[in-house]
């Protein structure tokens, strides 16, 4: 029997996020595989026909992982194909681009972009409920005027050679530094193009695939919201200075 090699995991495909179309005739899947050369993971979307039992590749941009069904024949997904927004991201701004594609083929069409780093989304009528990564240590460059942004960007880069930790935990396995970083809740209106964060400051939200109707929405967003707590660190003077850890509610 051949022994398992140290690089064998790079040869496997990892299907994730399988989601059925509203009519149940198709299923979309994000297939992830390791890119050893670039030290990252590539991801493309595949379509499975539940009647013919055939599965085929739909996208090939290597960055397509987050997606939803808009109807029985159309997917909305995130990727980074727009040069204009790629430059903004390189300059320090947070943007996520969205695309539409027919499951029967053809080129994906750019739909819109939001000034947040989106990790998850759910459809709620004509609105999208978004889970976004938010870094309170980083200035909101996307909402600044050019001159203000240049000054803030310079100051931010000058401080990148050190990190300030004032929370516990400040590090998480597989995530790196998590100090002052939260998953916040945002809503994008696909009719007006308005996008805004609706969760309270410094509150951690979790957007699930399935849940009950709950939260500050009058439209039928299928979400479940979990309020998180953070731990605070306190120094207690004594002959041997110690650190005491306790739970504090931030909201």
Question: Could you describe each region identified by the protein language model?
Answer:
Residues 11-27, 61-78, 84, 115-127, ...:
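Conserved beta-propeller blade repeats
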Residues 85, 89-95, 134-186, 233-234:
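Predominantly five- to eight-bladed beta-propeller fold
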Residues 7-43, 179-181:
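Beta-strand-rich domains and repeat architectures in extracellular enzymes and scaffolds
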Residues 138-141, 175-211, 215-229:
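Solenoidal tandem-repeat scaffolds enriched in leucines and small polar residues
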Residues 33-37, 81-86, 134-138, 223-227:
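Short glycine/acidic-enriched loop and turn motifs that connect beta-strands
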Residues 1-14, 47-65, 89-94, 98-117, ...:
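Multi-bladed beta-propeller domains
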Residues 21, 35-36, 49, 102, ...:
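Acidic/polar residues at beta-strand termini and the immediately following turn/coil
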């Amino acid at each position: 029997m051949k022994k398992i090699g140290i690089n064998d995991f790079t040869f496997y495909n990892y299907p994730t996020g399988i989601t059925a179309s509203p009519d149940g005739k198709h299923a979309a899947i994000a297939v992830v595989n390791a890119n050893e050369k670039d030290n990252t993971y590539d991801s493309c979307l595949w379509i499975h026909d539940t009647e013919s039992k055939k599965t085929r590749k739909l996208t090939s941009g290597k960055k397509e992982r987050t997606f939803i069904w808009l109807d029985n024949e159309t997917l909305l997904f995130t990727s980074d194909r727009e040069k204009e927004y790629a430059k903004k991201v390189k300059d320090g701004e947070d943007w996520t681009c969205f695309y539409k594609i027919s499951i029967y083929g053809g080129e994906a069409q750019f739909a819109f972009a939001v000034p947040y780093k989106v990790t998850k989304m759910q459809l709620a009528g004509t609105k999208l409920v978004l889970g976004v990564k938010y870094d309170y240590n980083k200035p909101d460059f996307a909402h600044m005027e050019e001159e203000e942004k240049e000054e803030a960007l310079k100051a931010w880069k000058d401080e990148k050679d050190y990190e300030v930790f004032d929370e516990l935990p400040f590090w998480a396995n597989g995530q790196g530094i998590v100090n002052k970083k939260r998953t916040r809740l945002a809503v994008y209106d696909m009719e007006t193009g308005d996008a805004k964060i609706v969760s309270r400051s410094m509150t951690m939200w979790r957007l699930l695939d399935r849940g009950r109707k709950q939260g500050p929405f009058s439209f039928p967003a299928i979400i479940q919201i979990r309020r998180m707590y953070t731990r605070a660190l306190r120094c207690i003077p004594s002959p041997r200075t110690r650190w005491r850890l306790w739970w504090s509610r931030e909201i």
